[in-house]
From Swiss-Prot:
The gene is uvrB. SUPFAM superfamilies: C-terminal UvrC-binding domain of UvrB, P-loop containing nucleoside triphosphate hydrolases. Gene3D superfamilies: P-loop containing nucleotide triphosphate hydrolases, UVR domain. It is found in: Cytoplasm. Residues 623-658 form the UVR domain. Keywords: ATP-binding, Cytoplasm, DNA damage, DNA excision, DNA repair, Excision nuclease, Nucleotide-binding, SOS response. The UvrABC repair system catalyzes the recognition and processing of DNA lesions. A damage recognition complex composed of 2 UvrA and 2 UvrB subunits scans DNA for abnormalities. Upon binding of the UvrA(2)B(2) complex to a putative damaged site, the DNA wraps around one UvrB monomer. DNA wrap is dependent on ATP binding by UvrB and probably causes local melting of the DNA helix, facilitating insertion of UvrB beta-hairpin between the DNA strands. Then UvrB probes one DNA strand for the presence of a lesion. It comes from Helicobacter pylori (strain J99 / ATCC 700824). This is UvrABC system protein B. HAMAP family: UvrB (MF_00204).
Length: 658
């Protein structure tokens, strides 16, 4: 029986049918690696969706940055509206890992800010993987980082049935063991409240509904689901499966074993420091670890508990840590891993382990952490690439590694379903690039189309943005410090024509699906380096390939070897596409793609939550936030997004009571 229900108004076209057939056949023949070489705009995402539907396996789709993850999530939600499409990226808005600089005797404490909505989506992904097979997870490099043992997670989850006998007090203790906190005042995700014989539980993986369990003595009398906003009953259930509030939740037995294991390791390490006559490190480690042990014994958690992950998961020293792959492969289930934009993603995955290990080794050496902290790490590249699953690498410009691993299992996708050609390109003198580009932008904007500009430095991007804004252009600048939510919003705003020109550095290359963009400008194209390599140039030029008027301007004083190779590949592909169009009498037409609903990662709520935590908020600041939210609330209501409008209304009311 098919797991996935793929919805699309169009059948595969162009090179898609042969690519889908070839790669599906390769996967069904149990080949470990395969590669899709697909030009920009050829519908690689749709090909991926068809392959998932035909291979009938849960899938993990990995990308190297959060912007692409958000875009893929949106597209796959549209392709598979009746299946479980999940989102798994880092849950930190801000993260400063703990570190020690010996030469300055400076210890830097871990400092982080967790995004509540991203945490909810991560929990939703792991719970879906443990409960269902029709799951597609869109993930960043976070998929390679350590998680709790999925089998322990299964032990902690609880099935609750109407009519079953349960001691009321032991049920509350079970909720605490599962990571839920009792809170009678602020009832939100990951908490529960108990009034009389009624227990309300707000699952950590769902922000829309909470569960009410009603007892009669020591018997469960009723289970109901309530709307979290309106507080009205939605439905009654005969039973419900309740998952833990944390991916690191463990049972009391495992917790006790972990405490004993940490104590044993501490004793060995203290003995080592004593023998080496390193009393400073001895006392430092003893004090820090014993405090952590007290906290774990009393509450089940401590600050930096991830550093003791090996003790909680039961892994041996240096053994591969549990991660998202283990949730996909639970019950020896077969699954598919698709690495999107593999030419960038794979090198990024390969560099994760070394940096993490370098920092933690210093912490261990100087007594800030036990050696087991080294096992709280991302996967090594060899561990990742040899996972017991099948891989599909997807890129317009795959590296040698992907092609060597895939051998003959490589499919090309050069012909676009729309008949669109690779863009025309032109090299212009960089001496007058700013003024020349300004004139080009005016003609593009007059046609109602958009422009992407890529620069080499942040300073140039800022100055260019300022210059063009002063000259009357609607322009925005996207830089690396902008978070995932805001990046997604900026791209959406560009498509909605809230502005016409987007300037960036290395943010405009892979995977940005912007059919409204007809002009891509590459400043200082002849400056050899990573940002102007053959691969980077081809990827950047491809941003103009979704529009029938697509054009690329490269500003340079000379034609470099990288530029020449990029021109040759682009010209080869364009010639092949033109020939196909001529044979089949196809006229290129710009892609028309509806604006899917963006990720509802409520940045407004996060901002207000932080503001509400402050003891004193100036009246002027409060009024400013209220005004901002009122505007957004009206916009949401106008767009018929009444649920979000009501959320904003409630936040405004809360602010006005301060």
């Amino acid at each position: 029986m098919p797991l996935f229900d793929l919805k699309s108004p169009y059948p595969p076209a162009g090179d898609q049918p042969q690519a889908i057939e070839a790669l599906t056949k390769s996967l069904k023949n149990n080949n470990h690696y395969q590669t899709l070489v697909g030009v920009t705009g050829s519908g690689k995402t749709y090909t991926m969706a068809n392959i998932i539907a035909q291979t009938n396996k849960p899938a993990l789709i990995m990308s190297h940055n959060k912007t692409l993850c958000a875009q893929l999530y949106s597209e796959f939600k549209a392709f598979f509206p009746h299946n479980r499409v999940e989102y798994f990226i880092s849950h930190f808005d801000y993260y400063q890992p703990e570190s020690y600089i010996p030469r300055r005797d400076l210890f830097i404490e871990k400092d982080s800010s967790i995004n509540d909505d991203l945490e909810r989506l991560r929990l939703s992904a792991t719970t879906s993987l443990l409960g269902y097979d029709d799951v597609i997870v869109i993930a960043s490099v976070s998929a390679n980082y350590g998680l709790g043992n999925p089998e322990e997670y299964l032990k902690v989850m609880e099935k609750i049935k109407v009519g079953e006998k349960r001691a009321y007090k032991s049920f509350l203790l079970k909720l605490v063991e599962m990571g839920y906190s009792r809170n009678e005042v602020v009832f939100d995700r990951g908490s529960f409240r108990a009034t009389g014989e009624c227990v309300d539980i707000f699952p950590a993986y769902n922000d829309a509904e909470f569960i009410r369990i009603e007892f009669f003595g020591d018997e469960i009398e009723r289970i109901a689901v309530f709307d979290a906003l309106e507080r009205n009953e939605i439905k009654r259930l005969d039973s419900v499966m309740l998952y833990a509030a944390s991916q690191f939740a463990v049972g009391s037995e495992r917790l006790n074993l972990a405490v004993k294991s940490i104590e044993d390791e501490l004793a060995l390490r203290l003995k080592f420091f004593k023998e080496q006559d390193k009393m400073l490190e001895y006392n430092r480690l003893k004090q820090r670890t014993e405090y952590d042990l007290e906290m774990i014994s009393a509450t089940g958690v401590c600050k930096g508990i991830e550093n003791y992950a090996r003790h909680f998961t039961g892994k041996a020293p240096n053994e591969t840590p549990f991660c998202l792959f283990d949730y996909l492969g639970i019950f020896e289930r077969e699954f598919l891993v698709i690495v999107d934009e593999s030419h960038v993603s794979l090198p990024q995955f390969g560099g994760m382990y070394a940096g993490d290990m370098s920092r933690k080794s210093v912490l261990v050496e100087y007594g800030f952490r036990l050696p087991s902290a080294l096992d709280n790490r991302p996967l090594k590249f060899d561990e990742f690439i040899h996972k017991n699953c099948q891989f599909l690498f997807v890129s317009a410009t795959p590296n040698k590694l992907e092609l060597e691993l895939s051998q003959k299992n490589v499919a090309e996708q050069i012909i676009r379903p729309t008949g669109l050609l690779d863009p025309k390109f032109e090299v212009r003198d960089s001496d007058k690039q700013v003024q020349d580009l300004f004139d080009e932008i005016k003609s593009v904007v007059a046609r109602g189309e958009r422009v992407l500009i890529t620069t080499l430095t942040k300073k140039m991007a800022e100055e260019l943005c300022k210059y063009y804004a002063e000259w009357g252009l609607k322009v925005r600048y996207m830089h690396s410090e902008i978070d995932a939510i805001e990046r997604n919003h900026i791209i959406r705003s560009l498509r909605l024509k809230e502005f016409d020109v987007l300037i960036g550095i290395n943010l405009l290359r892979e995977g940005l699906d912007l059919p409204e963009v007809s002009l891509v400008a590459i400043m200082d194209a002849d400056k050899e380096g990573f940002l102007r390599s053959e691969t980077s140039l081809i990827q950047t030029m491809g941003r103009a390939a979704r529009n029938a008027n697509g054009k690329v301007l490269l500003y340079a004083k000379k034609t470099t070897q990288s530029m020449q190779k990029a021109f040759e590949i682009t010209s080869y592909r364009r010639a092949k596409q033109e020939e196909f169009n001529k044979i089949h009498n196809i006229t290129p037409k710009t892609v028309t793609r509806a604006l899917e609903e963006e990720l509802k990662l409520r940045d407004d709520e996060i901002k207000i939550a932080k503001a509400l935590k402050k003891d004193k908020m100036p009246k002027s600041e409060r009024e400013k936030i209220i005004k901002e939210l009122d505007k957004k609330m009206r916009e949401r209501a106008k767009n018929l997004d009444f649920e979000e409008a009501m959320r904003l209304r409630d936040e405004i009311a809360q602010l006005r009571t301060l």
